């Protein structure tokens, strides 16, 4: 059906038919369909007819616009394609929305979000995708009802708004006229001017009332006047009106003063809160002046004693493997270690060592300045069972020789058994050539002023001073995994054993990781306990089991009289490992580089005053006993 036929139908019975079918809405709803594709237009027409709509079709947007302008009231809905050759569908949408205010549904095969959004923002009430379905077309009548309801509501609102505006204008005119009359009369009575001048003044007053009031800037001088007025009246009795009178400043209203007074009161309240908080803090810390609260906490700081320089600070990094072996906190945690007495002759010394820190041991100075508690436990007069007297040992590759019988106390070299994996690894390792020489350099780390006595080619002996039970002399011994020596299971670092320090451990030992833990036994009733150390290695199958006897002398075979301990410290003629008496339970903590010790020991040493009154000199690198 052509456009002309459609126009005749609309102008003829189509209108009457539409008018007759208005009672059965949406049956007979008038729809204008616009599409440049004849096939799509034909399908759309058939679907609309199946919905019992009156349909008018056209293939050009310009023709549809002309038809709408000529018959504005003859259509209820417009369905238009987006892409048309003569005119874009969005342009047609804008024109229909501006001129006819009809609901327009956009139809397109492009379902992109941007295209749909563009159609909705231009005023389309719906956006349908081709091919159109019958179910979608059966519900398009909702847009017609929605548009009519919105139009009716807008018309009603416009009418109401117009009536209200008209009434307000009338009232405003009457009020304005009355006000102008009163002002004109007052001005004539006061000034005696003409009516024209009064009218001009009234107009000026009306203009000034509509102007925005200038903002008040509180300068320093203005604030000083405000504060002076508040202080004169009192903060409790200060009100904006009285403050304004006392200030006597122009261009300031009571509202400005009231706002500033409120801010000023909040400021004073905040100051009082801060002051009370500082006072409470000062009272809590015992200070008198709140300004010195932070310094008050140091009032009794001198009770801890004065600082002193630890003389061995420079030796603790490389040479001092054990620096605090005589401190209670350098040993086992309280209550976690064994506390029963130790019997002599049934335990072995388990040493498993790693070589991370052995690179810093120069010429056997492994325990320089370190005091070690190598203490024995047992009844007085006990001897070492299972050890016979005979000749001293020679090398690590030889078998166990008889121990020689004499009153001398010697400490020969600590030898590893041939089956020991540590000996095998050290002897065969190409990276540590000096570690394999077990027959050369196992010496005692003693001060330089002590004479080195060689019972064999490279042996050192030291005089041992102690107060305690006498112990049978032992000449020399060798190490194996099962030799029962002392009645305490010593687990310690290589440096913790008296006179068991390798001199040639100055090679590069960075591949190893040195970690140690130290523990000890309780000391009861003037009995002495061995200091036990355990040195673990990060290398697999790397262990060293060396029983050791930390009791030696440097006398040439003369035992003499055992001298007592002197004030718990090392003398010039004393070996680094003296017997020390402690009656505290031991605790272990970690020091730097995996050593044993505690922070409390360091703090006690730092705050302990120097004891130089007794005149006893220290060996270089020695720490005080706690």
Swiss-Prot record:
**Residue positions where 4-aspartylphosphate is found in the record:** 81
Q: What spans are recorded as compositionally biased (Acidic residues)?
A: 191-202
Q: Where is the composition biased (Basic and acidic residues)?
A: 151-162
The record places the DNA-binding region at: 210-269
* GO MF annotations in UniProt: DNA binding; DNA-binding transcription factor activity
Q: Where is the composition biased (Polar residues)?
A: 400-421
Matches recorded under Pfam families: Myb_DNA-binding, Response_reg
Q: By its UniProt entry, which CDD domains does this protein fall under? A: REC_typeB_ARR-like
Q: Where is the composition biased (Gly residues)?
A: 9-22
| Any one of the GO BP annotations | cytokinin-activated signaling pathway
The UniProt entry, under PROSITE patterns, shows: HTH_MYB, RESPONSE_REGULATORY
Q: Which PANTHER family match?
A: TWO-COMPONENT RESPONSE REGULATOR, TWO-COMPONENT RESPONSE REGULATOR ARR10
Q: What does this protein do?
A: Transcriptional activator that binds specific DNA sequence. Functions as a response regulator involved in His-to-Asp phosphorelay signal transduction system. Phosphorylation of the Asp residue in the receiver domain activates the ability of the protein to promote the transcription of target genes. May directly activate some type-A response regulators in response to cytokinins.
UniProt lists the family membership as follows: Belongs to the ARR family. Type-B subfamily.
Q: From the Swiss-Prot or TrEMBL record, give the protein name.
A: Two-component response regulator ORR24
Gene source species: Oryza sativa subsp. indica
Q: Which gene encodes it?
A: RR24
């Amino acid at each position: 059906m052509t456009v002309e036929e459609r126009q005749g139908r609309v102008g003829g019975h189509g209108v009457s038919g539409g008018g007759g079918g208005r009672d059965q809405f949406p049956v007979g709803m008038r729809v204008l369909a616009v599409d440049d594709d004849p096939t799509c237009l034909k399908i759309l027409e058939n679907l609309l007819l199946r919905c019992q709509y009156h349909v008018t079709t056209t293939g050009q947007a310009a023709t549809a616009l002309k038809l709408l302008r000529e018959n504005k009231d003859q259509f209820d809905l417009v369905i238009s394609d987006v892409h048309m050759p003569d005119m874009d569908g969005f342009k047609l949408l804008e024109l229909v929305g501006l001129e006819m205010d009809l609901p327009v549904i956009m139809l397109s095969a492009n379902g992109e979000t941007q295209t749909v959004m563009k159609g909705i923002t231009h005023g389309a009430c719906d956006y349908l995708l081709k091919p159109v379905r019958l179910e979608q077309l059966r519900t398009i009548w909702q847009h017609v009802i929605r548009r009519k309801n919105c139009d009716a509501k807008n018309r009603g609102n416009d009418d109401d708004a117009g009536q209200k505006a008209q009434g307000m204008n009338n009232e405003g005119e009457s009020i304005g006229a009355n006000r102008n009359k009163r002002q004109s009369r007052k001005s004539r009575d006061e000034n005696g001017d003409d009516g024209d001048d009064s009218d001009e003044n009234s107009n000026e007053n009306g203009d000034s009332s509509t102007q925005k009031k200038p903002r008040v800037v509180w300068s320093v001088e203005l604030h000083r006047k405000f504060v002076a007025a508040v202080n004169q009246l009192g903060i409790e009795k200060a009100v904006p009106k009285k403050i304004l009178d006392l200030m006597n400043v122009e261009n300031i209203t009571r509202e400005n003063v009231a706002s500033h007074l409120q801010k000023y009161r909040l400021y004073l309240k905040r100051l009082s809160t801060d002051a009370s908080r500082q006072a409470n803090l000062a009272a809590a810390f015992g200070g008198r002046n709140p300004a010195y609260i932070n310094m008050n906490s140091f009032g009794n700081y001198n009770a801890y004693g004065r600082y002193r320089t630890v003389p061995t600070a420079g030796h603790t990094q490389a040479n001092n493997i054990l620096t605090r072996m005589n401190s209670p906190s350098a040993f086992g945690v309280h209550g976690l270690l064994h506390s029963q007495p130790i019997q002599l002759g049934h335990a072995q010394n388990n040493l498993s060592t790693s070589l991370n820190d052995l690179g810093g041991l120069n010429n056997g100075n492994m325990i320089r300045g370190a005091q070690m508690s190598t203490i024995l436990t047992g009844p007085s007069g006990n001897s070492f069972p299972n050890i016979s007297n005979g000749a001293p040992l020679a090398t690590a590759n030889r078998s166990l020789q008889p121990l020689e019988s004499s009153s001398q106390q010697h400490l020969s070299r600590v030898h590893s058994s041939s089956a020991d994996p540590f000996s095998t690894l050290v002897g065969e390792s190409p990276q540590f050539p000096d570690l394999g020489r077990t027959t050369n350099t196992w010496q005692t780390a003693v001060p330089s002023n002590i004479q080195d006595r060689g019972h064999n080619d490279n042996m050192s002996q030291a005089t041992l001073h102690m107060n305690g039970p006498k112990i049978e002399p032992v000449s020399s011994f060798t190490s194996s995994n099962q030799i029962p020596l002392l009645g305490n299971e010593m687990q310690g670092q290589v440096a913790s054993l008296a006179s068991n320090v390798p001199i040639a451990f100055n090679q590069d030992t960075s591949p190893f990781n040195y970690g140690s833990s130290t523990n000890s036994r309780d000391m009861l009733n003037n009995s002495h306990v061995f200091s036990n150390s355990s040195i673990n290695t990060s290398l697999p199958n790397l262990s060293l089991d060396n029983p050791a006897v930390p009791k030696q002398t440097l006398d040439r075979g003369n035992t003499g009289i055992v001298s007592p301990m002197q004030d718990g410290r090392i003398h010039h003629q004393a070996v680094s490992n003296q017997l020390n008496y402690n009656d505290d339970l031991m605790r272990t903590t970690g020091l730097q580089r995996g050593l044993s010790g505690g922070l409390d020991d360091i703090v006690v040493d730092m705050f302990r005053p120097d004891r130089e009154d007794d005149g006893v000199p220290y060996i270089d690198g020695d720490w005080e006993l706690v």
